[in-house]
Every structure is written in C-alpha cells, then in structure tokens.
C-alpha cells in the first residue's frame, strides 16, 4: 500500500564497556541488526534522509563554522543553546544510518565527524563560545552533552576511536573545571539544561571506567537537590509537574538516573526514574502522544499550550529507557502512540521541515518560522526542533525489535524486513507483511539460515486492543492479553509464520477541564482529526460528533501505493456521523494540516462518556498502614458522570480485585480497617477507578498507582477533609480568637493572638504580628475554573519596599491560583498561571476594617472591597496549579518575607464563583455567619 524501502543497516546492541553493570536492564537493542521499515513510516524515513539529513549541513554551514568562529571578532551573537545543533543533528543522522544503509549518508557523516573533531580546542573544549565563557555560562554544558551523545552514538555504530577520544577530552575539561575546585556545575546556571551532562558522563564512564567521570556525576547528583531534585522527589512520590524543574530538558537529567542505576545497582535510582515516567504519562502526556504544555509539565493533558517537538523527542528517549529498564509493554505502547501521531505530525511528509509546535488543535507551522529567532547567518534553517525532530524516527531502531537475553521481543507491528541475531549469535530473518496501523492483520515470516533453533519470541499486544488471536502456521492459536506480551517458546523452522489479528474499532477519550464536552477519537493507535482540506465547512461550523452512532462510521484509504504515491494524501479517512444528520470526515493526525489548513483533534461531541479519572493519593509506591487511608482522584467537570468504582488488585496476579467499592459519588473514599482485611501484609497492590455515566464508563489513566500494605507502618496519607462543605466551601474559619476552621483542615499556625473583631467584640478575630506569623490551611478542593475567597482585614502596618499577603495559595514560580496582596499601601487581587495577572490597586488605610473578596468566574477575576466590585480583569479560564495549601498573612511555601501585620476575621474559601449579591451579603453585616449553617467538619 505504501512505498517500501530496501535493506538498511541498524543498531549495535548495548556497547560493552570496561565497567560491569550492577544494575541490569531487562531489554536491549539487538546487536548488529538490520532494519527495513516499509509503509507510511518507511516513506517518512526516506523523505527525512533525502530532504533533510543529506542537505542540512550544506544548507546551514554555520552548524560547524560556529565552532571555528568562537574566538573571532566580532563575537558571534548566538542563542545560549547553539552548541547543541551539531550534536542533535549527528544523533539523528547516525540513528538514520542504522535504518538506511545509504552510501552517501555514511560518507557524508564520516566527513561531518572528521570536520567536527578538528574544531576541538587544545584543552578539549568543543563549543561555540569565546574562551572567557567556556563551560561557565549559557547552555554550554548542555551543548557538550548533545555533542557527546552524537559522538558516542557514532562511535557505537562505527567503532571510531577518534570520536571516543574527543568525548574523553571534553569530559576531562569539564572535570578540570568543576571537580576539586570552588566551582560546581550548579554555578553554570540553566540547571536542568547544564546538569543533563550527567547522562553522557554515565555512558562515557561505563565505556572507559575513568573514576573522575563518576565522581563528577556524584557531585551533580548533590547539586540536583538545589535544582530539579529529581532523586528525592521521585522517591517521595512527588508528581513530576510539581517538582522544582518541570521543564522538558529535565527529562535528559532523568536519563542520568538510569545511568546511575546501571553503574551502582542501587534501587533508589530505578525507583525514582520509574515514578517520574509514570507521573508524566498520567498528568502531562497529551492524547497525541506528545509531551509538554508550553515546554514543561503543567499537570493537565487538556491544556492548550504549545506541544514542542523537542519535548516529544525527549519523551520518546525517556520511554525507550523505561522499556529497557522494566520490559513493560506499556512503554512500547507509548512509543508507538507518540511516533505515529505526535512525531510524524511534527514532520512534514515532504521531509523538508519539522514543527516547533504540533498542537492538538491549530495549524502546522515550520519551526524555521515559529522560532526564527534562532536562525543566524550561515544557519538559516537551524533551531532546536529542526535538528532534533528526526531523532524520533531514528529511535525506532532502538525499540522496534529487542532482545531479553533469551530471544526476540517484537514491539513494532508495522511492515518491514529485519535481519537479527539471537544472543547466542544465531541469525534470524523476520519479515512483517501488513498494512498496520491501517489494518489489524499482521503476518510475520521467520527464516533461519543455519537451520531450526529453539528460542522465545514475545509479541506485543497493544493495551488499546481487545484480547487478540495469535496463530502459528495457520493452526495452533493463542489469545494475547491487551497491554502485555504473548510469549511463544518453540523450536522455530524456516518458513514458520505467526499471524496477529487486532480489532481496530473506533475508541474514545473524553476531555475534561479545557477540553470538557470534547473527545479524541482513535482507530487503533491512530488519533483522528478534522481537517479543513477534507470537509466543505470550516472549524466554527464543525458539528458535534454523534457518539451514539459510532458504529456507523465509514473508513476509507485514499492513499495510492507505489513510488508515485501522494505524500500529502491522508493515510485514511473516517466519515463520522454528527449532529443534525451531518457527517464529518476525519483523517489521521500525522496527515492533518499538512497543506496549511486548520485541523482539530479535540472534537465537540454528543453522548460523551466520562473523562478518565487521574489518581492522586496515595502516591505511587506509597506504604499504606493501619487506620483510615484516603484514596483520591481528580474531580470532574463533565456532567455525564454519575458515580465511581474503586478496585484494588494484587500487583502480580491476574485474579479479580480483592477490594471493590461501588456507587461512590465523590472523587475520594477512605478505606477503613474493615476494608483492609482483604489486604495481605507486605503485598504490593495496584488500584484503579472506574468513572460511570449514562453513556459508558472509563477506567482511570494508566499506569495504575501502586502501594504496599504494611499493618505495622504509619500510613503516608494523612486523613483530611476532602469533601466540600455547603456552598462548595473548601475552608471556613470564623477566626474567633483562634484559627481552627469549622470546615477544612488547619495545617499549621505559626503564632497568633486573639483580637477584637469588626464589631469590637473581644476575641472575635486573630492577630498576626508580621515577622513570621501566618495561618496555613490544606487546599483539599481543586482551584481550576471558578472559586472565591473572602475575609475581613484590618492592617496593623503596611509592608515597606515589599509586598505582604492577605491570602496566598502560591506553589512555585508563576503558580498561584489566587492571592490578595498589600503593596505600596494598595490592595490587589492577583493570579499567577504561567504569567502574572493583577487588578489595579485599591488604597487602604492602617487601622480600618475592610471586607475583602476575590472571585474568579471563568475568564474574569474581580476584586471586591466592602461588597463593591472595584475592578475585573481577564484571566485564563482554567488555572493549572500544583498548590496544596493556602495561607493567611503570608505565603504558604515561599521562604522569603511576605508576611503581613494584620487582624483577620471570618475567612472563607469556596470552589465556586460567588455572585455580586453573595459578596455584598458577606460584607453587609458582622452578624450571622454565612455558609456555615449547623454542619461542621474540621481538623
């Protein structure tokens, strides 16, 4: 059906170094393998070779020339990461050489590497910056990291000792700069970027055994604690988006955890890495398989910010490591999803360019346009994504077919021919005849040039599929479980065939938050999208899909086979019934927008199932002890949900759940001792939530969280009030002389006294003196779209030269869902979500009582003083926050001085937007207390 490629040369396996690996990987690349990928992916690989890899250095000669000009005048004005371009290009090109044994590419790369090596300074420096700046600033260590990766990959593929020696000289200079002296890698700044050098240092240490490389890795590990803190947060179960450095570059630091595991065998590194990978998958992997929103993790797969190509490539590299580390089929599922959708969606089918941003909805723009600020004379097409995107295709040779040390592990289900060797050196020829992912029928034929051989082959059964039939030689049949490998151990003969039948039924993922009322639609692993090019109506007129008629959708395959195939044609079209008897034609995401037309993959729909819950507590890997343990998951904004079910299974068994709680109406439940009687001490368990609604049910996002039951341990999850009070109250505290709430949880009170309130009654308010005193409450309800806060305030003094917080829920830089601030004797309502938003200031006086409220209602934030609206400002409809606490009189997490000398009374925080009338009522009298009624629940 598609253009097939000829013979290709492929990956060497794991290169054997001089350092024995104490931490073992479960899967490895097949040594000396040859791959020939066919089908649509093979066509994209060929286009990438012809239109980019062979011509990029000639069209952008500054890729190498910048290294020669580093000490010339005038000093080149480069972007801080310019040193990465040659390294990223080299990694991508060598990986492509593994796939296409192209004489021209091999000769081209030999010359490229030879020229690159001549630009290394006598002291070992290999970067584009002047002598005064070497390794000390910019992203210079980051550039050296990518150059080392490229040269080590070239050395692994060719055995070029000069490339390895160049890496050693680079590493030696880095060690001279940052070992045994006052300087630390931390001092270079741009921490998540420059500290990624730990990854390439680990590879180089395993190859050479040079002790100082490991010593520097250990020093970087210490510096992590002041930067990304990847090890400690991973062990503590902190979600990746809530770590100090959630930018995408940190994923390459996480690869350093795998190197530390391989070198030391200490389980903490493996545990931390796995936690972060799982956390990213649950909270920040978009339905296209792409990672990041605005170049970092934000804790929502529904956010609409840019999905950068470099971020997705880093996610692919991280997922290859996860697959090798754990052998879990889930990691291979993720690699397939991201490759077929986000990665191929980022590449134009012509092979001429890659995007910077491949959004779920929007247009495809060449990175050379979107981030043109990176271009310079001599490098008109170079930017981070242009040189990095091709790596997504090259990585296929790392995971398509692997070995577990016994036999073969087949992850790639598409067409192609593969020349492989078993661990004992036995040659195996494998041919895959299929139109997958367009067809669910896959047929493998095995050839054994040396005669019959006994070994296992493991076939991946995708997690999205139904139980699948696997048939040997059109006879013996087995059933493969979704999300697992089916292993077949036998004496194989030349001509043996194995056939896999996958059901490519349409499936749905409902959206939440920003994507509420919308769905993503898949056919097998392929994400579908509306494209102007295939419909006579434009995006504003896009009708809602009628999901009750999903079975009536019609699939067609318009692409013509052969060498004259139209590369701009979609792989498939799906005519989907829509509202009002209309029909919407959907194409594969990889082809959507390739002609410059607008596209959408979050699609409006009728009769939606609930969105999949995302588990929150207990954190992954927790120890659950005696007493009550709260299980919590994301709240919903989708009206199609009616109830939840909680299921708990033993981690290593296929038996049914040992705990099942039905008809739950809140996104949390407390498991008491009675329910825990089914749990065995020391046993590991996984738990899952099923959201149920009138139009179907859906399981929580994979991977499921895990916990170990230990009746002798103290549970890591403190019991809190997760339920909202009347009026969606999160916290309500009268503050009559003490901070105890009538609803919610007081986490800590760092000093206070009682004081007269607005009516003059004694002990009807609390007083904070300013230097260190504040009241901190648990933020157990989600602040997302609509919420309000109100409190009576009397300033005792105004902060001079700084701000003071009446109320703040600050969680980190540019992450505060709401704050009421005093600055320069003025009162402000503010919000930080990626950027700062602030009302104008309202003058306030010391010694006077004010009722202050801030209300966020969708896209508006309004500041009220004494019941009157002072100003409304536009803000994001949905706020993405990591906040888990709020404070009165200070900032709950900021170590600096934002304290306020103030008297406070009647504090309320609610997870809904108050009306103007409700605010006036709260401000009108200091008499019956609003919102409390006769009920109360607090800690």
What positions do the PLM features span?
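C-terminal beta-rich recognition modules with glycine/proline-rich loops and embedded aromatic residues
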Residues: 273, 333-341, 346-448, 481, ...
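Solvent-exposed loop/turn segments flanking beta-strands in beta-repeat/beta-sandwich domains
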Residues: 636-652
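Extracellular glycan-associated modules
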Residues: 713-939
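Extended ligand-binding groove/face enriched in aromatic
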Residues: 71, 75-81, 96-230
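Low-complexity, Ser/Thr/Pro/Gly-enriched N-terminal "stalk/linker" regions
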Residues: 13-85, 103-127
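Extracellular fibronectin type III
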Residues: 692-712
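Well-ordered alpha-helical segments within folded domains of soluble proteins
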Residues: 79-98, 139-155, 190-206, 245-262, ...
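Beta-strand-rich modules
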Residues: 679-695
């Amino acid at each position: 059906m598609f253009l097939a490629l000829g013979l290709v040369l492929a990956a060497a396996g794991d290169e054997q170094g001089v350092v024995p690996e104490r931490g073992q990987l479960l899967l490895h690349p097949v040594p000396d393998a040859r791959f020939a990928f066919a089908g649509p992916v093979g066509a994209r690989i060929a286009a990438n070779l012809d239109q980019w890899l062979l011509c990029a250095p000639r069209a952008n000669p500054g890729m190498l020339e910048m290294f020669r000009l580093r000490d010339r005048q005038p000093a080149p004005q480069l972007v801080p990461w310019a040193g990465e371009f040659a390294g990223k290009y080299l990694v991508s090109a060598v990986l492509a050489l593994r796939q296409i044994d192209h004489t021209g590419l091999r000769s081209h790369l030999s010359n490229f590497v030879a020229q690159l090596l001549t630009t290394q300074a006598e002291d070992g420096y290999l970067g584009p910056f002047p002598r005064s700046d070497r390794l000390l600033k910019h992203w210079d260590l980051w550039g050296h990291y990518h150059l080392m990766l490229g040269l080590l990959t070239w050395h692994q593929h060719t055995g070029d000792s000069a490339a390895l020696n160049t890496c050693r000289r680079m590493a030696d200079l880095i060690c001279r700069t940052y070992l045994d002296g006052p300087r630390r890698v931390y001092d270079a700044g741009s921490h998540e970027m420059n500290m990624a050098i730990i990854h390439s240092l680990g590879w180089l240490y395993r190859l050479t055994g040079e002790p100082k490389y490991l010593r520097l890795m250990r020093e970087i590990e210490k510096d992590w604690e002041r930067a990304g803190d990847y090890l400690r947060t991973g062990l503590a179960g902190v979600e990746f988006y809530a770590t100090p450095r959630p930018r995408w570059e940190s994923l390459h630091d996480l690869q350093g955890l795998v190197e530390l595991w391989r070198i030391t065998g200490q389980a903490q590194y493996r545990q931390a890495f796995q936690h972060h990978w799982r956390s990213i998958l649950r909270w920040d992997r978009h339905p296209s398989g792409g990672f990041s929103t605005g170049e970092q993790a934000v804790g929502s797969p529904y956010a609409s910010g840019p999905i950068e190509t470099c971020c997705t490539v880093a996610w692919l590299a991280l997922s290859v490591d996860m697959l090798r580390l754990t052998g879990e089929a889930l990691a291979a599922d993720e690699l397939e999803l991201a490759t077929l959708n986000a990665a191929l969606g980022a590449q134009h089918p012509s092979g001429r360019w890659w995007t910077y941003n491949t959004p779920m909805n929007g247009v495809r723009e060449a990175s050379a346009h979107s981030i043109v600020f990176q271009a310079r004379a001599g490098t008109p097409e170079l930017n981070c994504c242009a040189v990095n995107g091709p790596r997504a295709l090259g990585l296929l040779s790392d995971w398509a077919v692997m070995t577990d040390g016994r036999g073969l592990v087949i992850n790639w289900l598409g067409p192609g021919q593969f020349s492989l060797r078993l661990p004992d050196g036995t040659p195996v020829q494998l041919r895959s005849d299929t139109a997958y992912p367009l067809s669910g029928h896959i047929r493998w034929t095995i050839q054994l040039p040396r005669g019959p051989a006994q070994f296992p082959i493991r076939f991946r059964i995708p997690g999205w599929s139904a139980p699948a039939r696997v048939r040997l030689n059109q006879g013996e049949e087995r059933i493969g479980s979704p999300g697992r490998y089916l292993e077949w151990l036998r004496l194989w003969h030349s001509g043996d065939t194995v056939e896999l039948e996958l059901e490519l039924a349409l499936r749905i993922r409902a959206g939440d938050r920003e994507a509420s009322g919308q769905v993503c639609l898949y056919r097998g692993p392929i994400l579908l999208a509306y494209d102007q090019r295939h419909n006579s109506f434009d995006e504003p007129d896009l009708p809602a899909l009628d999901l009750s008629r999903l079975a009536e959708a019609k699939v067609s395959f318009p692409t013509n086979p052969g060498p004259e195939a139209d590369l701009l044609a979609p792989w498939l079209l799906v005519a989907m019934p829509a509202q009002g008897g209309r029909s919407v034609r959907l194409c594969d995401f990889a082809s959507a927008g390739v002609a410059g037309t607008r596209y959408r993959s979050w699609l409006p729909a009728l009769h939606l199932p609930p969105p999949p819950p995302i588990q929150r507590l207990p954190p992954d890997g927790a120890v659950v002890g005696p007493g009550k343990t709260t299980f919590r998951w994301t709240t919903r904004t989708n009206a199609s949900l009616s109830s939840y079910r909680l299921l708990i299974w033993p981690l290593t068994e296929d038996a049914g759940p040992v705990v099942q709680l039905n008809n739950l109406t809140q996104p949390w439940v407390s498991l008491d001792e009675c329910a825990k009687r089914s749990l065995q001490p020391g046993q590991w368990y996984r738990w899952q939530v099923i959201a149920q609604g009138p139009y179907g049910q859906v399981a929580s996002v994979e991977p499921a969280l895990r916990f170990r039951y230990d009746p002798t341990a103290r549970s890591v999850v403190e019991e809190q009030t997760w339920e909202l009070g009347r009026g969606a109250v999160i916290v309500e505290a009268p503050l009559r002389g003490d901070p105890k709430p009538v609803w919610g949880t007081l986490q800590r009170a760092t000093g206070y006294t009682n004081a007269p309130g607005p009516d003059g009654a004694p002990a009807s308010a609390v007083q904070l003196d300013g230097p260190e005193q504040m009241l901190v409450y648990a933020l157990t309800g989600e602040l997302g779209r609509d919420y309000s806060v109100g409190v009576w305030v009397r300033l005792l003094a105004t902060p001079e030269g700084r701000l003071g917080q009446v109320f703040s829920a600050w969680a980190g830089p540019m992450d505060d869902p709401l704050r009421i601030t005093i600055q320069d004797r003025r009162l402000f309502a503010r919000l930080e979500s990626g950027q700062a938003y602030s009302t104008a200031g309202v003058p306030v006086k010391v010694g006077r009582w004010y009722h202050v409220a801030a209300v966020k209602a969708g896209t508006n934030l309004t500041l009220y003083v004494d019941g009157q609206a002072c100003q409304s400002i536009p803000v994001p409809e949905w706020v993405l926050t990591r906040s888990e606490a709020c404070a009165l009189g200070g900032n709950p997490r900021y170590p600096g001085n934002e304290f306020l000398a103030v008297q406070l009374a009647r504090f309320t925080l609610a997870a809904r937007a108050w009306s103007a009338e409700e605010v006036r009522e709260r401000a009108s009298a200091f008499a019956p207390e609003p919102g409390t009624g006769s009920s109360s629940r607090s800690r």
